[in-house]
Amino acid sequence: MSIVDELYSEIDNGREGRNLGLKTGLPKLDWYTGGFQKGVYKLIFGQSGSGKSSDLYRILRDYPDRDIVHVYFSLEMSSKVLLAKLLNLYIYDTYGIEISYMTLMSVREKLSDKYYKYIQESRVWLNSIIHKLIIFDKQ
């Protein structure tokens, strides 16, 4: 099939509603971008605390069976800190418990057995998504 044929095939797919991108969970962003489309790269950037990690988590959560690879560049945190943030989001989403990075790493006090149980139970999820992440960090 030539590139012209592929283009027209995509146009036909769109007319039949099959080119809808993966939803981001942010309707206004989906309106402007068409969601995440195959073969189209999106650059998401923002200030610290603006929700970039949450957006990444939402995609990992909502599309676990999709073969989507995420490249994450960070100049402010290491890979371990990013994974800790994703772990925290998963635990909050799954169990309704927020465990801060300071608590997770026992910075101020020893991590409780209750929290440790949730962290251990979440390890399977973290292992299931790690192959979908390519992280370039500040180190």
Q: Model regions: which residues?
A:
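Cytosolic-facing regulatory segments adjacent to core modules
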Residues: W31, V69-Q139
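The Walker A/P-loop phosphate-binding site
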Residues: M1-T94
